[in-house]
């Protein structure tokens, strides 16, 4: 393609996507907030902080000046965590190629963003900040994937969702390879809602998984098993569908394909999942003990040492449930745990009792 690509965000997922594209011979620059990370990518062709053990292509270079990274690029991929995404977008608004609509913009960030009337999907929020010609042309990329696997060439599938068929296809060809399969979707709202909401379910799944494997040390009793996890997974998928429809999803198959059940499954079950890991840490390491409530946890999230997107999403999902009058007990229960209103074991018993 001979594409000029910028990836804004040098975390694990941004680095993995940049590696895939650079590995196809494209001109790729990645923007890093941290000078140390940029120096390591350029000098040692690695990113030991976010993607240890992965060798990066020599034609992939890093910069710390965001306008240098974004300027004159044909493709721009936003990879900052949801907490920092709007700040990243505001920094590129003065870039001429962005201001003049010469760049196709894709987003790989998962989550919701705050709005004046409550939480919003990522693309609809970004459209308010970007020039008007980007409306209905942004591309959202999601699917059952982990940076640790994609960067090592494990076969994986992604969804390229956009109201612009042309731009969806352009990103498909930019990303796809023999080991990375990319499919198109026009249900942009459904794909975004599923990608954000599944992180909340994954934290609950991680708690259950920890209780299942260490029940004797928690006082929960040896009552949780693989079948219990399947109950939670199925009920969680139903909650994602309920929320997605309320937010404007247009296709039922969005939730039965890789953007729905596929993404939920890998997020819940993979050892690489940060949300699953956080759920396990709630049980095994009592990681919530230093925090008074969810707001305190979010404001001090850096103390965790990694960023589970489901923590931020839980607050937004709770607000959306109230706005749309939705019954989504797993998501609300998880919010109450993070807000220090209830204990994990009690939540799981309440959830199971609610199924009877």
Language model region names:
Residues 1-53, 60-64, 115, 221:
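NAD(P)+-binding Rossmann beta1-loop-alpha1 motif at the extreme N-terminus of oxidoreductases
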Residues 5, 27-28, 136-138, 182:
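Hydrophobic anchor at the start of a short beta-strand
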Residues 56, 63-155, 171:
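Rossmann-like NAD(P)(H) cofactor-binding subdomain of soluble oxidoreductases
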Residues 129-137, 155-253:
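Internal alpha-helical scaffold of NAD(P)-dependent oxidoreductase catalytic cores
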